[in-house]
Design a protein with these regions (language model features):
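N-terminal pre-Walker A segment at the start of P-loop NTPase domains
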Residues: 1-13
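Hydrophobic anchor at the beta1->P-loop junction of P-loop NTPases
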Residues: 24
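Domain-level recognition of nuclease-like catalytic cores that cleave nucleotide substrates
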Residues: 391-409
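Accessory nucleic acid-recognition modules appended to NTPase machines
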Residues: 182-353
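Conserved lysine of the Walker
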Residues: 32
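Interdomain motor-coupling "hinge/lid" segment immediately C-terminal to the ATP-binding subdomain
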Residues: 111, 116-226, 230
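Conserved catalytic/switch belt of AAA+ P-loop NTPases
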Residues: 88-112, 119-121
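Hydrophobic positions on the alpha1 helix immediately C-terminal to the Walker A/P-loop
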Residues: 35, 39
Length: 409
């Protein structure tokens, strides 16, 4: 097994020069601890590692946080800090007294904006970052370049990265992006995901919500996976899992909190009044989707009924990972109105809206971009659009609408 360098490494070291605390969140097994422990060796400051997965250590952190910090003195790496939110107030006191950059590195398996106590206690004192499973650019060793529709940037990137065909893209989709699988540490993919669900996900759901029926929860997360890249339908999910809608909503919130799924919200404003309000649901790791929906090989997934949804999930998650890895907030939306006009992704930035369509075709037709015109009604300017597809080379319909191979994202 070899360590796969993460795009976030330099960002962590850079922020550690100005922030006393860094909180890195993300799903379990996404590589947070591995990366930070590798960086600890690199910085060579004698940073101690302590995990709150250990029940004795967790008990001290919760019930006597002052003693915990006396024993585990900074610089320190505290793993799974969400188990002891009581620490945050004492970390704040230490930061205010000492002002030492890089004193506290922390990881958490709950998305930071949903974690109890962080915003109240450490506001302005902590750098908040999110780590997803590996991006395809990390896997192939490419630079961290968040996706853009800037033609010059895209042309330059397409020269640096070796093109791949559709079967290779679906091999990446099916294999997934969890470091343990990609690095070769775990050879049996099915066993890995089975253990991942029972050892980590179900346990964390139980920790957050109390009791949980494992069978019904497995039905539920499978139903979510079967509807990836679709509008979030609580009623259908509840029906499939034989639970009530209140529980379905709670479990969706928990999966989002754990970094298993993310929601893409619709773009709307006062002018575009006919847009729908329901978000779409995606997984950070398409390998988990393929496991849950029982696609036995990349070839079957590529030819199956879900191939379009899998490709869309992969593409949207890759765009999101690129921005997260650069420590930048991604402003991503989709568009759908009551007249059935739809745009898969809208990127907002610099006063412009850049529309993106995702297609499983190597020969995109210009008619695909006809819906981009709905953005003209928005107060923001229509930026350069793109069709993200299986084309082997970069191209363009015209100056304002590009053709971008998905391998280059």
């Amino acid at each position: 097994m070899s360590y796969i360098a993460r795009h976030m490494e330099n960002r962590i070291l850079e922020l550690s020069k100005s922030y006393s605390a860094i909180l890195l969140t993300g799903p379990r097994q996404s590589g947070k601890t591995t990366m930070l422990r590798a960086l600890s060796k690199e910085e060579n400051k004698g940073r101690e590692y302590v995990s709150l997965d250990d029940l004795t250590t967790r008990d001290m952190a919760k019930n006597d946080p002052a003693l915990f910090l006396q024993i585990h003195k900074p610089p320190v790496l505290i793993d799974e800090v969400q188990y002891a939110p009581e620490l945050f107030t004492y970390i704040k006191i230490h930061i205010d007294e000492h002002h030492n950059p890089g004193d506290f590195w922390m990881t958490g398996s709950h998305i930071f904006r949903l974690m109890r106590g962080v915003q109240e206690s450490l506001a302005g004192r902590v750098a908040l970052l999110h780590m997803s499973p590996l991006s395809q650019r990390e896997i192939i060793g490419a630079d961290c370049i968040p996706f853009t529709t800037n033609m010059n940037v895209l042309m330059d990137e397409c020269k640096k990265i070796a093109p791949v065909d559709t079967p290779t893209i679906f091999e990446r989709i099916w294999r997934g992006s969890m470091p343990g699988i990609v690095s070769g540490l775990y050879a049996d993919r099915n066993m890995y995901y089975s253990s991942y669900l029972s050892t980590y996900v179900e346990r964390d759901v139980r920790d957050i919500s109390g009791t949980v029926d494992a069978l019904k929860f497995n039905r539920f997360i499978t139903a979510v996976a079967a509807r990836t890249a679709q509008l979030l339908n609580y009623h259908a999910l509840a029906e499939d899992a034989e639970i009530d809608i209140v529980t379905a909503k709670a479990w969706v919130d928990i999966l989002e909190t754990l970094g298993i799924i993310f929601l893409l919200h619709p773009y709307s404003n006062n002018v575009l009044k006919r847009t729908i309000k329901t978000p779409k649901v995606y997984f950070y790791d398409t390998g988990l989707v393929c496991y849950l929906t029982k696609w036995s090989s990349p070839e079957v997934a590529e030819s199956g009924a879900m191939s379009g949804a899998l490709l869309e999930n992969f593409t949207v998650s890759e765009i999101l990972k690129g921005y997260q890895n650069a420590g930048r907030e991604p402003y991503l939306y989709f568009y759908r109105d009551r007249d059935a006009k739809e745009i898969d992704v809208i990127m907002e930035g610099d006063g412009k809206l850049c529309p993106l369509e995702i297609k499983k075709t190597a020969t995109p037709d210009k008619r695909i971009i006809r819906t981009f015109g709905v953005i003209d009604k928005s107060p923001l300017q229509l930026g350069t659009g793109a069709v993200l597809c299986m084309e082997e080379q970069f191209g363009a319909f015209d100056r304002d609408n590009l053709i971008v191979p998905i391998w280059a994202i």
